[in-house]
């Protein structure tokens, strides 16, 4: 999912947000949230789907919708509004395939706007290892940005890009009692290498999320009496970067995304600011909101298990 620069796709594929949508979904969430029962557990730790970086779980997922606004640097600078989706399905135990797409509205300064789909992306992920006692997980996989599947009006590439990636997650529930209030902390992250079939530069795509789970604090450390909606929230900060490695690719670009996730049994709503790390990335703060539907809890007959085999 590339738009003019690899950085744009890194920001836009994650989640796409407007405060009005966020407020509406939070109002629906108030109908009664419970502890999340969807995918993403290692031991007692629930790792939520993150927005700017991918989580390490090969499970059934439906991200719909994902909305964002960000103004990237350039001559001219371009304001991008993005509506996206992602669907992943576990095929074999611990192995999932996915597809994602984005519909873009681009408005360069002083020029007419253009709209259209960016290139669609296929993904594969395999959970290679996990340790429940130490709340740790490691996965391998990658993405295939399918060149020629998007609109040239929004700068979709005609060439393919393959990005082999490693994914990791670590919760800190194994810390000693003297550090018990640090146990709700967890980190997830990814490291990938772009391999374009064109003359575009190779990029190191890397990022991580640092989160503090209030549901984990309440259930696994100490019930401090938080009420809804706070007891269902996970504050986090995400860091997402793209570092060109050759072919005069320029400087590293990226964003820092502080925000919060709200967990219920059937869905997650997340909202983050998009803060550029340098002038090469952009000069204005953007916003993103994303709705993740836990389809394995809504339709357990159809989702939450592999098509072939049994992961119990």
Language-model features, listed with the residues they occupy:
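Transmembrane beta-barrel domains of Gram-negative outer membranes and organellar outer membranes
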Residues: 37-312
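Cleavable N-terminal export/targeting peptides
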Residues: 1-41, 298-312
């Amino acid at each position: 999912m590339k738009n003019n620069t690899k950085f744009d796709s890194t920001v836009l594929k994650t989640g796409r947000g407007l405060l009005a949508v966020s407020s509406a979904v939070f109002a629906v969430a108030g109908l009664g949230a419970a502890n999340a029962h969807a995918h993403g557990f290692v031991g007692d730790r629930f790792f939520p789907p993150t927005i700017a970086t991918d989580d390490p779980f090969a499970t059934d997922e439906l991200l719909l919708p994902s909305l964002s606004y960000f103004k990237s640097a350039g001559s001219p600078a371009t304001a991008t509004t993005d509506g996206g989706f992602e669907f992943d399905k576990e095929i074999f135990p611990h192995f999932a395939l996915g597809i994602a797409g984005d519909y873009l509205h681009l408005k360069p300064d002083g020029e007419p706007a253009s709209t259209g789909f960016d290139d669609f992306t296929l993904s594969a992920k395999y959970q290679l290892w996990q340790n429940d006692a130490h709340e740790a997980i490691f996965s391998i996989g990658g993405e295939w940005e399918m060149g020629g599947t998007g609109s040239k009006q929004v700068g979709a590439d005609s060439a393919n890009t393959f990005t082999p990636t490693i994914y990791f997650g670590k919760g800190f529930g194994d810390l000693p009692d003297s550090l018990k209030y640090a146990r709700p902390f967890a980190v997830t992250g990814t490291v990938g290498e772009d391999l374009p079939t064109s003359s575009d530069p190779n990029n190191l795509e890397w990022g991580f999320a640092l989160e503090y789970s209030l549901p984990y604090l309440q259930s696994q450390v100490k019930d401090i009496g938080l009420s809804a909606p706070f007891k269902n929230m996970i504050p986090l900060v995400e860091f997402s970067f793209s570092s060109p490695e050759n072919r005069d690719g320029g400087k590293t670009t990226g964003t820092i995304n502080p925000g919060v996730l709200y967990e219920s049994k059937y869905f997650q709503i997340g909202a983050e600011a998009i803060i550029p790390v340098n002038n090469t990335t952009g000069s204005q703060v953007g916003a993103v909101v994303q709705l993740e539907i836990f389809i394995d809890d809504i339709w357990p007959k159809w989702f939450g298990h592999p098509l072939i085999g049994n992961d119990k």
